[in-house]
């Protein structure tokens, strides 16, 4: 048995119920476990296509399962389904079964999943005055600041605090993906999150999942 990511990790009261002892380090371990699984699928030329938290079952931070694998894209069989928040701008609104996904499309979904594990359950394009997610994705209207660069629509409260506590090298890459459309390979995320885990272990950064103030 295990817990569906969407209804355990991504809902704060349920996160505290199912994983009461988890800290940032556990969610980074979980991210690394998922990324290593995705990387090995990519090496076998399999694209998940509909990567999303409803299709990931968490047994522990080191053991996860993908479900709905019948929609995986294998060779010339397209993945016929998708999820708005995990669909990159260039294929928003397209008929999923009418084309083949590329790894570049999947790298967008991977970055979204990483973001939503770092800020548990918060999609990257949700913002104050929240307009339509698909529209925000198409415009790449990303609301989390990088230095002075901001659209001043960052969601209030805990989300701002979590973002402020992330190391610059992670914020920089997330900003690059969601504002500048520069995606990185799965192996690069593995390197960045391994570095983050190391920095957490040194006590340089907060291990709280929901810090209550800015860094």
Locate the predicted segments by residue.
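Catalytic-loop of the protein kinase fold
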Residues: 38, 42-59
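A conserved short alpha-helix in the C-terminal lobe
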Residues: 105-117
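Conserved C-lobe activation region of Hanks-type protein kinase-like domains
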Residues: 114-168
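A conserved short helix/loop substructure at the end of the activation segment
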Residues: 124, 165-171, 177-188
